[in-house]
């Protein structure tokens, strides 16, 4: 099975879906002639032309509205946000028109758009370029959110998102773009709403998503080698729809839970997961649920401070040991 980067996996998904469906197009700032800010769309404009890759003005509200309107007429636009932080400029279009259209039309209209781009800190670009808005997006009925942690999932989830008839946000991570994983040549889809157990264990469940799932896996290996703790790592893949069953089954097996995310702690994704575990698996818990998240402050420009602010292997191990105490 070939090793390809997270970036290449997303590009393959986009390329294959453009070829599969004549209604799929990509739009955003510099996605065509410049090949995308992070080169995710490199070569696609040269291959597919102006009708399938559309360079837009620097107005997220305008091209998000364009995509939503086009989708109501049968087009399947993939909208690239240079930073997912910039989607805030288009909140009215995405959160009002995009999310509610199918409900408010009684199912007469769908909005099959994908909004994709990096949603992470850790790159020293400051607070306004480092948002992780998966919790905010997931709060809106009608919107779906996925956070691929590796190249295999990035390709499979992207293809599923493009084929879905509802708006799907694909939250990527710039720190993963150059990382390689095994990705098969043959066609496959990763279903929305299905979590993945990265590592089985019996003593502690770690629930995470995106890059934090990979950090949690590293921490789980260290915990087993150094402390003899058998950790099960659940990669959510999808925030909404959420695979509650996999989370609860794991917690019922290990009786302890550590929730890890790059979101800020207040009203984060893990606040909702903690509620679900408390409500549906409280009697199975042998210890309080623990959380590791970003320190609750705007992201720092300073690399040293931001490295301390975001979850890392050391902080995850510390949280796991507290959960086992």
Predicted regions and their residues:
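Thiamine diphosphate
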Residues: 1-171, 307-308, ...
